[in-house]
Amino acid sequence: MQIGEVMARVYNFSAGPSCLPEEVLEECAREMLDCNGTGQSVMEMSHRSSAFEPIIAHAESQVRKLMKVPENYKILFLQGGGSTQFAMVPLNLALRSGKAAYIQTGVWAKKAAAEAKKLGIKVDVIASSEDKGYSYVPRVEKISGDYDYAYICFNNTIMGTHYEYIPETDGIPLVADISSCVLSEELDVSKFGVLFAGAQKNLAPAGVTLVIIREDLITENPRPGTPTMLCYKTHADEGSMYNTPPCYTIYVLGKVLDWIERKGGAAGIHALNVEKAQYLYDYLDNNPGGFYRATAQKGSRSLMNVTFLTKYSTGATDEASLAKEKEINSKFVKQAEAAGLVNLKGHRLVGGMRASIYNAMPLDGVKALVEFMKKFAEENC
């Protein structure tokens, strides 16, 4: 391969970091050495310069517009990933009773609950789908009690499940991790106290975490011993610039939001996502001979993360069955990669395969995957 040559693009089904819109990548490439006539890359800009100020302001404005964020909410660009929010939420919200309600629908909600417990919060797991391998989202119509907040993970990347409803909370602030579904659908922000999303699945490269928080939940007095960097007020007061923000990631995030707007906003993107997911689920549910099956139950299926097994994943624990299952899964992933379909290996807790079809994944990518799956099934039935 010669310098300057570009390899053929693959379809990247990674759970995150994930694919970005090609036109956004091309635009960023054009501006790499000279952004907005400044004669410098965003990578080189001072975060307090007049060159960067409009970049972060634009990103914030686009979040507010596309997500219809009410004026009494702050938009923050933080660091530390979604996992840091597992601590920031209880440190800033568990201030009265010291109690919180968690609905446990997968690994990430479970980790969030464990982090809160570590900080001395009385955590009540009020519902869980662990009994069925997190293959569904339990229905909790209303959350009530002496809780400082209630916590959910709106989309579960590992298990491929998603909330089809928003629990009523009787005035209790509802916190939601929307890392893997942010702007994949319309969401009524006013029903939540805090929303947060790591950017690396649907918004930008890894490095920034979007936090949307109702202003009355931003306290001057978090739990004793809370580090300055883990206080929401620290960042709200400084416009997300208490310390140096991830400037380039925020720049790309703004470009992705512009792309989403051109696609019709959250509603337009959601329609495309439904079409992609339905195409794949239809094949999984109706493939000849039942070679494949989806793992998530109908009514809880994610539009973003589609998890599936082959007929060789029987649940048998004998050595021969396990060896055959491993062989087929490995063969599928390897041959898919050779066909330009990468990062399809399922999480170790579920096994099988996982196709993450986030906003930037085109329908053609899903169609290419299904065609490969048909061929693989014929050759390995």
Residue ranges and their predicted role:
Residues 292-336:
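Conserved PLP-binding catalytic core of the aspartate aminotransferase-like
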